[in-house]
């Protein structure tokens, strides 16, 4: 079976969804920009030699509809002979895109693929057009479709206090801002055209979602966002609304070697699981455990983790049940996470994987694990190994 390697991984800056840098930039353009950039950064691979493009996106309507993967590829002037498909596993969509491409390569059905994902939550809101079947209430609590209430449930079940959530959220912003100031994101962010507050077109090379002024004291003043009577989850401890895209060049090790391209890491294992929709945010725990089992590893073998921060109330129970509470500052989301950077749904799986690869190199560790919860009760995880 072919070994799957990651040759390159990039992303756009994360733009604010409300009046942010990409308010006049379409999701297809963000995607096409990264497709062009990956090919330009790796000229040894001819675009026509791509076997497929797998692109994650959740709200596949309006500008993100009608197979945005193909639309973006055409905009990027990828040869017409290269196919493209849009993948939807809600929050895990672009990580699922990676898994789909990896399996194609493992089985010999492909040698080189572009994978990634996008979500423009300013143009296509998360709830746009959502119409749950009324019969679902026979099997699933209605609140299971309200992500904030599932986070509240996890907080109650695991004893996660408001103070713990506020502290974790402040940490996310502080870490992300420190990474920005130190240039830690420089290798992953591709400058992307957008508009400043005055409407002037400019190139953005930083995440505008981060709030460096965030403090625990300021967060403590916010009201609960989902359960106004007894809730603990606030807007400040929830993932920010942002627009962005991320992309990876995935190949067989043999093809990369033949082209003289140096792999950054290989895909050691992959896992997807289901869980109770009412605690959808717990999905990373069984997903990570299964991925580790497939890799023949334990959590202690992993040098760095990227765990998507849907909510502080959600990620903290996952960290706790993976036995990592004492290692947060050494291993978990060292450059901040979605609370600071935002969670553009279809983008985030590739985004956290891209950040993870850079952290693995910076920390000089062998193994890294990226994982995320998925709305309506799923979890997805990938173990990477440097090569």
From Swiss-Prot:
CDD domains linked: thiolase
UniProt KW keywords: Acyltransferase, Cytoplasm, Fatty acid metabolism, Lipid degradation, Lipid metabolism, Transferase
GO cellular component, one term: cytoplasm
Catalytic reaction equation(s): an acyl-CoA + acetyl-CoA = a 3-oxoacyl-CoA + CoA
InterPro entries: FadA (IPR012805), Thiolase (IPR002155), Thiolase-like (IPR016039), Thiolase-like_sf_Thiolase (IPR050215), Thiolase_acyl_enz_int_AS (IPR020615), Thiolase_AS (IPR020610), Thiolase_C (IPR020617), Thiolase_CS (IPR020613)
Disulfide bonds: none
MF term (GO), any: acetyl-CoA C-acyltransferase activity
Locations listed in the record: Cytoplasm
Principal place of residence: cytoplasm
GO terms, biological process: fatty acid beta-oxidation; phenylacetate catabolic process
Job description of the protein: Catalyzes the final step of fatty acid oxidation in which acetyl-CoA is released and the CoA ester of a fatty acid two carbons shorter is formed.
The family this protein is said to belong to: Belongs to the thiolase-like superfamily. Thiolase family.
Subunit structure: Heterotetramer of two alpha chains (FadB) and two beta chains (FadA).
Protein name: 3-ketoacyl-CoA thiolase
Species assigned in the record: Escherichia coli O6:K15:H31 (strain 536 / UPEC)
Lineage: Bacteria, Pseudomonadati, Pseudomonadota, Gammaproteobacteria, Enterobacterales
């Amino acid at each position: 079976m072919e070994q799957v390697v990651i040759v390159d991984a990039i992303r756009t800056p994360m733009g604010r969804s409300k009046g942010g840098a990409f308010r006049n930039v379409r999701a297809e353009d963000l995607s096409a920009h990264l497709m062009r950039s990956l090919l330009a950064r790796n000229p040894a691979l001819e675009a026509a030699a791509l076997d497929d493009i797998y692109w994650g996106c959740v709200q596949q309507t309006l500008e993100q509809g009608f197979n945005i993967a193909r639309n973006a590829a055409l905009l990027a002037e990828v040869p017409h002979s290269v196919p493209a498909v849009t993948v939807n596993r809600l929050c895990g969509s672009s990580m699922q895109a990676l898994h789909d491409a990896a399996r194609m390569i493992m089985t010999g059905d492909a040698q080189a693929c572009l994978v990634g994902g996008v979500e423009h939550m300013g143009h296509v809101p998360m709830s746009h057009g959502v119409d749950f079947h009324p019969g679902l209430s026979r099997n699933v609590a209605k609140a299971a479709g309200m992500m904030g209430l599932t986070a509240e449930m996890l907080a109650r079940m695991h004893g996660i206090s408001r103070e713990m959530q506020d502290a974790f959220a402040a940490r996310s912003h502080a870490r992300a801002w420190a990474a920005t100031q130190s240039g830690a994101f420089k290798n992953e962010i591709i400058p992307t055209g957008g508009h400043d507050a005055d409407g002037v077109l400019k190139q953005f090379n930083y995440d505008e979602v981060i709030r460096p002024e965030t403090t625990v004291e300021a967060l403590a003043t916010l009201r609960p966002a989902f359960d106004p009577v007894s809730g603990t989850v606030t807007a400040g401890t929830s993932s920010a609304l942002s627009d962005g895209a991320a992309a990876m060049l995935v190949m067989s090790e043999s093809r990369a070697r033949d082209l003289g391209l140096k792999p950054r890491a290989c895909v050691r294992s992959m896992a997807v699981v289901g869980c109770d929709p009412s605690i959808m945010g717990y999905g990373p725990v069984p997903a990570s455990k299964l991925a580790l089992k497939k890799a023949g590893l334990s959590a202690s073998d992993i040098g760095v983790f990227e765990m998507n921060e849907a909510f502080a109330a959600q990620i903290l129970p996952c960290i706790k049940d993976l036995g990592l509470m004492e290692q947060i500052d050494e291993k978990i989301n060292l450059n901040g996470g979605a609370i600071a950077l935002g969670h553009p749904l279809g983008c985030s799986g590739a985004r956290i994987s891209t950040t993870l690869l850079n952290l693995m190199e910076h920390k000089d560790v062998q193994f890294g694990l990226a994982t995320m919860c998925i709305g309506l009760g799923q979890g997805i995880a990938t173990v990477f190994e440097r090569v």
